């Protein structure tokens, strides 16, 4: 059962409570390239990104935040490290949320200045704790970025914001070690009702990043923990968005658009099952209808394995049996099985 947290409004997206889990990503174009950032932001929006983070190393770079915000219709989060004046500048241009890493933002007076700027414009703050940048005294106490250390850091900074009468807060507590990350989120969720942004930081190259994020983020969601997610990948941010939705779909959350399932194939396979499955998925990109499509290798296990699909095929030599809701309908034959199958999919 999902652990319900208080609601926080980020631009036109509300997280927490019973609201849908929002999928985020972060631009990776150099901040000086405003045109490139705007173009990438538009691609992320088209891919379905719901909340978009943009780095802002200095106050002067707030002009990039402003340009991106004016170019898309999704909330923009300013990612702030070290320079608290960058956060103030982003608040001035109307950013929708500010993410700070409390371990490097500076003394309490600087944090207070950021809080006051956000209070004036009702801008939420994400406390972004990262296992790689914990405060020195906390690392000295625990010896490593263990879950208890990360939770202590997060709660310290929550109390700091609360001391300044600020509770428009989101928390993340990321680590590149999946078991540590999961245990940290468990401990944090047990003691706070602020919404949680879930992710695995520094997850690695694309393939390993997908695996670690699937385990970490998916595992947390299955435990009912998480209100917004970001899949961190060494890849284009549009790929992070796609991966985020795939994780949501894999753990049972309703996601608009098609899901293509296929078997791993074996020696019984007599038609290009994998190639057809990949091509079906490619052709269905951007298709908005929520359907499950199965491409199975043979008629031995295929029909049973695809019974929960809306439509599917199970192949044989030069032919494939078409199934709709688990029932065999007809055979598709010849050199154009893929095209025939796509025609049937669009009829569903």
Question: What would you call each of these model-derived segments?
Answer:
Residues 18-36, 55, 74-82, 138-151, ...:
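Active-site mouth loops of central-metabolism enzymes
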Residues 71-74, 92-98, 119-122, 189-195, ...:
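Glycine-enriched alpha-helix->loop->beta-strand junction motifs that scaffold or abut catalytic
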Residues 59-80, 113-125, 185-196, 280-284:
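Alpha-helix-loop-beta-strand connector modules within alpha/beta enzyme cores
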């Amino acid at each position: 059962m999902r652990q319900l947290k208080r609601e926080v409004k980020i631009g036109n997206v509300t997280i927490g409570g019973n609201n849908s889990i929002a999928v985020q990503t972060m631009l990776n174009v150099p901040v000086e390239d405003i045109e490139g950032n705007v173009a990438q932001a538009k691609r992320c929006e088209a891919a379905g990104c719901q909340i978009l983070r943009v780095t802002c190393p200095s106050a002067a770079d707030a002009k990039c935040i402003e340009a991106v915000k004016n170019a898309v219709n999704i909330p923009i989060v300013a990612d702030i490290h070290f320079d608290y004046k960058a956060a103030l500048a982003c608040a001035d241009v109307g950013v929708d949320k500010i993410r700070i890493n409390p371990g490097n933002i500076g003394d309490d007076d600087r944090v207070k200045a950021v809080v006051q700027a956000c209070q004036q414009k009702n801008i939420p703050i994400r406390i972004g704790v990262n296992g790689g940048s914990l405060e020195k005294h906390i690392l000295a106490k625990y010896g490593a970025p263990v879950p208890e250390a990360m939770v202590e850091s997060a709660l310290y900074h929550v109390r700091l914001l609360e001391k300044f009468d600020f509770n428009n807060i989101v928390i993340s507590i990321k680590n590149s070690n999946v078991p540590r990350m999961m245990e940290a989120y468990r401990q944090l969720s047990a003691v706070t009702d602020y919404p949680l942004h879930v992710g695995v930081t520094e997850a690695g190259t694309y393939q390993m990043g997908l695996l670690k994020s699937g385990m970490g983020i998916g595992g947390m969601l299955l435990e009912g923990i998480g209100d917004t997610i970001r899949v961190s990948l060494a890849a284009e941010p549009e790929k992070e968005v796609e991966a985020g939705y795939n994780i949501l779909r894999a753990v049972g959350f309703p996601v608009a658009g098609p899901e293509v399932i296929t078997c791993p194939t074996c020696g019984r396979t007599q038609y290009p099952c994998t190639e057809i499955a990949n091509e079906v998925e490619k052709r269905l990109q951007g298709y908005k209808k929520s359907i499950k499509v199965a491409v199975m290798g043979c008629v031995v296990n295929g029909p049973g394995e695809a019974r929960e699909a809306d439509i599917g095929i199970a192949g044989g030599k030069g032919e494939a049996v078409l199934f709709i809701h688990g029932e065999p309908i007809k055979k598709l034959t010849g050199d154009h099985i893929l095209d025939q199958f796509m025609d049937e999919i669009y009829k569903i």
